[in-house]
Amino acid sequence: MLPSSTPGPGHATETCPAPPGPERSPAARAPAAASSLGPVSTAGRAPRGLDMSAQEPPQGRRFPIEAGDSRGLAAAPESQDSPEAVATEHNPVRPLRRCPGCHCLTLLHVPIDVYLAMGGSPRARAT
């Protein structure tokens, strides 16, 4: 092995997160890793309490459910992150777009009487 291919004590490799120290063979590292996990069961596996996949916290809702909220319409955390909206019977998908010349969002296909009832201006817009 060439001396230049072996990292020295002052060199850090990008793929190894371990701090520099005395080199150990893989056979010497296995008992040390097993002892750091705690007691080993008779089957040779770590006890269930030390399983790292079971340590993940459960995904919760981003906002708490308040009075008047319907649990049936509450979105799962996985579906909240998806960019595409899902239309149901109670919450139809309504496309939003920017008004030309301003920064407000407009709803497409809103009937004019609903627009006027919400305080919209009855004058025609210049296009």
UniProtKB/Swiss-Prot annotation:
Residues passing through the membrane, by range: none
InterPro entries, A to Z:
FAM229
UniProt similarity note: Belongs to the FAM229 family.
Q: Region Disordered: list its residue ranges.
A: 1-96
Q: What Pfam families is this protein classified in?
A: UPF0731 (PF14982)
Compositionally biased, Low complexity: which spans?
24-39
By its UniProt entry, which PANTHER family does this protein fall under? PROTEIN FAM229A (PTHR35355:SF1)
From the UniProt annotation, give the residues forming the signal peptide.
none
Q: What is this protein identified as?
A: Protein FAM229A
Q: Which gene encodes it?
A: FAM229A
